[in-house]
Amino acid sequence: PLYSSAASDVYKRQMLILPMGVFAQNLKFGHINAMEIVSAMPEYTKAQSELQALNKQLGQDLQRSQEEFSKKYQEFMQQKDSLPAVIAERRQKELEDMMQRQEQFQAKAQQDMEKANNDLMAPVYKKLDDAIKAVGAAEGVIYIFDMARTPIPYVNEAQSINLTPKVKTQLGIK
């Protein structure tokens, strides 16, 4: 044969590696800071205001309940020695029930806050994700890394494009 088997293998490998090298040179990567983008979105500001208002209302309700419990507890402690045993036991049971309702209210308030957060923020994050995908497709990048969510200790700006401004533009944010 004109070519030896070893030379043929080297030639085949070079032909396989050459396109990979050319392909690797065309890879484009991007990165963003999602927190910078989200915090500039009007939808985020509105959602945060609603969450703060709900948190304030729940906090006031809890405080009112705690003050009522504290008042009844102090009254009970002042009167317990002068109350008949049956009445003292009934009031103590009422206090225990109040305490249990308070704990249930606190747990429910926490669940309500989490649900409200999810409900209000889901559309914000969907809008952000849609904008990221649109910019990624328009820029022809393979990946867009979120520097706010993924701790990447080093980004070579010559190899990775900062797409934060373009995502903001896509969202109509300055």
Task: List where the protein language model places each region.
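Amphipathic, charged alpha-helical segments and their helix-to-coil junctions
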Residues: 24-174
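Single conserved hydrophobic/aromatic residue that forms the stacking wall/gate
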Residues: 1-11
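Cleavable N-terminal signal peptides
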Residues: 11-12, 22
